[in-house]
Amino acid sequence: MKTLNRRDFPGAQYPERIIQFGEGNFLRAFVDWQIDLLNEHTDLNSGVVVVRPIETSFPPSLSTQDGLYTTIIRGLNEKGEAVSDARLIRSVNREISVYSEYDEFLKLAHNPEMRFVFSNTTEAGISYHAGDKFDDAPAVSYPAKLTRLLFERFSHFNGAQDKGWIIIPCELIDYNGDALRELVLRYAQEWALPEAFIQWLDQANSFCSTLVDRIVTGYPRDEVAKLEEELGYHDGFLDTAEHFYLFVIQGPKSLATELRLDKYPLNVLIVDDIKPYKERKVAILNGAHTALVPVAFQAGLDTVGEAMNDAEICAFVEKAIYEEIIPVLDLPRDELESFASAVTGRFRNPYIKHQLLSIALNGMTKFRTRILPQLLAGQKSNGTLPARLTFALAALIAFYRGERNGETYPVQDDAHWLERYQQLWSQHRNRVIGTQELVAIVLAEKDHWEQDLTQVPGLVEQVANDLDAILEKGMREAVRPLC
């Protein structure tokens, strides 16, 4: 069986116009996959050079396959049908290591055609590293490497205004474009680079903040033999991902034309502010996960897919989204509903086995950031507590007993909550405190909730009633009236 390379698998090759920091699965099944579609269907005509930003030889370089690899996109499509689509990606030309090919790295700045910089250097990547110097070959941090590359371009083209770049980070931090820009400016000032360069950074370059959304499951280790048999070739860089994807870019409207998004419809939005889209994702996608986990797990289920195929649990989650979360969010209702419908489809994806216990990690913080804002907004606007979000809080407190049907399970959270719950549930079992007192102690933790939740009218009583129902009847019976 042949391994992928451009000699045995000839096809389109595009001029290099995109630099990408990061060789990982996510960018390859997200950005490079989208670039490949745009190259095929429009005149974008842009090849990618991947820069490996860290010093490691594992996995090996994409250049061993001449930049070629296969994505397998699978999940439920818009009609709810299970689909699996293999695509040979030709958008990546080569990969270089900034550590062993530093001169080659700087040379990227000399190419007049270079226009875009994408990156995913993990959440920790957009950060300041105190020891980084201009002459380091290379500097440690990604922002310092980028500053050096931008200065190389500025110098090579004598500060030409039309040679700036559009910089689009995909790291999962809030306003990632702003954060990256601030660090680049910080290094430029620290390294005493000329004022003209700092002006050029501001005037000729765009730093765009983004929201990225796609579950990328990466190299399908358990299915490789079967998949390669179907494909007819060996591919050491196979990359699997879900069907859904969303790319929200806060940037100039002209970006849509530059990326040829006006010529081929991708799920990419160019917006003035990513904040409402971030809130939508946190409230609907992450919020639904957080509401679902303690309810479904204590109802005897183990994965998100099982939960969504369970008529009662699925109804509980969908009603929580449509009746309690969406009404308090600040975006057009039709946009929110179409996003919600995509979310429930993603939860049903038969190709992804998402363990409820792995999502349960740090559940107390997740509840505070993902569900509490909607619970409080609902109470404020209607004068009544949203029944399902309140029940989810009771289910969460019950979850920290760490016991299901007489068997224990691991609970992962910070030490404070693990100790607190161990103490509270032990006191409850020994009848030292009642359910209402237990709930009041949890809700009074100002340091965690950033307010005293016992002051929210009716919340302690409602959560205590729900918790008693869970303890007395079991989760299935307790949740049924809300399904």
UniProtKB/Swiss-Prot annotation:
Record protein name field: Altronate oxidoreductase
Annotated GO CC locations: cytosol
Pfam families, A to Z: Mannitol_dh, Mannitol_dh_C
Similarity-based family: Belongs to the mannitol dehydrogenase family. UxaB subfamily.
HAMAP family in UniProt: Altron_oxidoreduct
EC number per UniProt: 1.1.1.58
Keyword NAD: yes
Disulfide cysteine pairs (residue numbers): none
A single MF term (Gene Ontology): tagaturonate reductase activity
Protein origin, superkingdom: Bacteria
Biological process, per Gene Ontology: D-galacturonate catabolic process; mannitol catabolic process
